[in-house]
Swiss-Prot record:
Subcellular location: Cytoplasm
Family annotation (InterPro entries): dsRBD_dom, RNase_III, RNase_III_dom, RNase_III_sf
Active site residues of this protein: 43, 115
Species the sequence originates in: Coxiella burnetii (strain Dugway 5J108-111)
Enzymatic reactions: Endonucleolytic cleavage to 5'-phosphomonoester
Family per similarity comment: Belongs to the ribonuclease III family.
Gene Ontology MF terms: double-stranded RNA binding; metal ion binding; ribonuclease III activity; rRNA binding
Protein name per its UniProtKB record: Ribonuclease 3
């Protein structure tokens, strides 16, 4: 019995070309034949599938709201959690250094692997099979699309707050530390003419920027930062 059979059962697809699945599970630290190209493809396919569902289920929603709802469905946290739920982490092929540093638990690696698998299924069986698999993975979240709130992220809210007051847009200064396989991003957010300066630290640049933006909002007099998300939306 192939050791990938259990994973394919969880994914809901038996690959005709098993090599595609193997590549989708191979991180760049493990060799040249890795999942980066499949991840590139899968990112677009996944975005299209969710966008299509939102378009059909939310006929009254505006373009900006649809974009924010799609982003909340395909952000790194969401994909990493789904990847773990499907047990993809158990099958990842990592280089020795990445393996020792806990790569099988790293959010970005888990999310990228899921997108790569989406790309692999698309190549192996086409869009409709890929759509069926993806919607099955999301489960009840798909049924909730008709109720999903188009929550704005911190960076968008900060930009709107500043534009409404004819103030300059924020500047995000980024400092990167650590090895290539385990980078830490430190982002400082400030606005010319305002006294505030905030910092966000995370393993991805976008989340660090969101954290810094949220903290900046919380310093503003009207409490604009309350109840918003730091998620990478």
């Amino acid at each position: 019995m192939n050791h990938l059979n259990k994973l394919m059962e969880r994914l809901g697809h038996q690959f005709n070309n098993l090599e595609l699945l193997k590549i989708a599970l191979t991180h760049r630290s493990s060799g040249a034949d890795n999942n980066e190209r499949l991840e590139f493809l899968g990112d677009s396919v996944l975005g299209f599938i969710i966008a299509s569902e939102l378009y059909q289920r939310r006929p009254q929603a505006r373009e900006g709201d649809l974009s924010r709802m799609r982003a909340s469905m395909v952000n790194g946290d969401e994909l990493a959690q789904m990847s773990t739920k499907l047990g993809i982490n158990e099958y990842l092929q990592l280089g020795v250094g990445e393996q020792k540093s806990g790569g099988k638990r790293r959010r970005s690696i888990l999310a990228d692997a899921l997108e790569a698998i989406v790309g692999a299924i698309y190549i192996d069986a086409g869009l409709e099979t890929c759509r069926r698999c993806v919607l099955n993975w999301y489960g009840e979240r798909v049924d909730d699309l008709s109720k999903l709130s188009p929550k704005k992220d911190a960076k968008s809210l900060l930009q709107e707050w500043l534009q409404a007051r004819r103030l300059p847009l924020p500047t995000y200064e980024v400092k990167i530390t650590g090895e290539a396989h385990a980078q830490t991003f430190t982002v400082n957010c400030y606005v010319k003419g305002l006294p505030h300066k905030t910092e966000g630290v995370n393993t991805t640049r976008r989340r660090a920027e969101q954290i810094a933006a949220k903290r900046f909002l919380e310093l503003l007099d009207d409490g604009k930062g309350d109840g918003i998300t730091e998620r990478d939306q």
